[in-house]
Structures are given as structure tokens and as C-alpha cells.
């Protein structure tokens, strides 16, 4: 079991029930809120204790249902799982401070694939770091944070 932060950043309302049922199968109950960045969609953030295999299963289910999400898993091997309907799933290893880690074996593979081209190496590193996923998920994150930071009227 590991501390797991599940943030369904954007899910079509038509998929919310199925995602909710999938979460309930892990004894998790989402509190759906509108996603201000995209009309007709919802979001939810849930803290959980889940095994690695359950996190993998959940992320595969959510991507099939068209959700954009991120799951931070603080297990013996911390990771960040990013999901976007247009890009699919991306699993990133994290260090103790939450920074993305590219392991030596991965780096060696990237160097070989780049074939001596600096621009190709830079492109491959961006893919390995999940830059495209992070860029596409950021507007949902920011929209959610802006809404929660608005002052309440008295």
C-alpha cells in the first residue's frame, strides 16, 4: 500500500458515473466538481492508500473512459502517472523531493536513439520527462486552483 493522490482533472460528464464506479471498487468516493476550463466536464481529487497494481488498473480504466488525470504514488518507488485522452498514459519515476528522474538505462537508450543528434536527444528527453502530458494537463490544474482561490462573498 502507498499514499496515493488521484486527481481526475477533466472527465466528460458522460463518463463520470463509470469512473465513479471504478473508484468505488477501491472503496473511494469522488466529490465531483465542475471543471472550469472545459464546460460539460467534471473533476475530483481523492487521497487513497492503494497497491501499485491497483493504481495501474485504475489508470488504465480512466484513460479508456476519456479522463485527463494525474496520480501521484508515494510508494517504495514513487511515481507520477499522467493520463490524457490524446496522448495515453505516461509513468514517470520521482525522487524523494518529487522531481522527475531519468534513470541511467533510460538515458543510455535515449543517447543511442538520438544517434548523435542534439536536437533529437532534446526531443527524446522531453518525451521521457512527459513534457507533452504536463503541458496539456497544466491548464486544468491552473483552472482548478484559480477557482478554489477566489475569495468568498460575504
Could you say what each language-model-derived stretch is?
Residues 20-22, 35, 58, 81:
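Generic alpha-helix signal with a bias toward terminal, lower-confidence helices
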Residues 1, 36-47:
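Short glycine-rich, basic-tinged beta-strand/loop micro-motifs
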Residues 6-8, 19, 23, 44-46, ...:
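Hydrophobic beta-strand residues in large extracellular and virion-surface proteins
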Residues 1-32:
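Short, extreme N-terminal segment that most often corresponds to the first beta-strand
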Residues 46-154:
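Charged interaction segments
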Residues 30-38, 62:
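Short, exposed beta-strand/loop patches in secreted or surface proteins that constitute
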Amino acid at each position: 500500500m502507498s499514499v496515493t493522490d488521484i486527481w481526475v482533472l477533466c472527465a466528460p460528464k458522460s463518463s463520470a458515473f463509470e469512473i465513479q464506479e471504478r473508484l468505488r471498487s477501491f472503496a473511494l468516493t469522488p466529490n465531483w466538481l465542475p471543471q472550469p476550463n472545459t464546460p460539460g466536464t467534471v473533476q475530483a481529487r481523492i487521497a487513497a492508500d492503494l497497491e501499485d497494481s491497483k493504481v495501474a488498473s485504475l489508470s488504465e480504466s480512466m484513460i479508456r473512459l476519456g479522463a485527463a488525470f494525474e496520480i501521484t504514488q508515494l510508494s517504495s518507488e514513487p511515481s507520477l502517472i499522467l493520463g490524457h485522452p490524446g496522448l495515453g498514459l505516461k509513468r514517470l519515476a520521482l525522487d524523494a523531493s518529487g522531481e522527475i528522474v531519468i534513470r541511467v538505462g533510460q538515458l543510455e537508450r535515449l543517447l543511442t536513439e538520438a544517434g548523435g543528434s542534439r536536437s533529437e536527444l532534446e526531443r527524446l528527453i522531453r518525451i521521457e520527462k512527459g513534457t507533452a502530458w504536463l503541458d496539456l494537463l497544466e491548464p486544468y490544474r491552473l483552472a482548478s486552483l484559480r477557482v478554489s482561490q477566489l475569495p468568498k462573498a460575504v
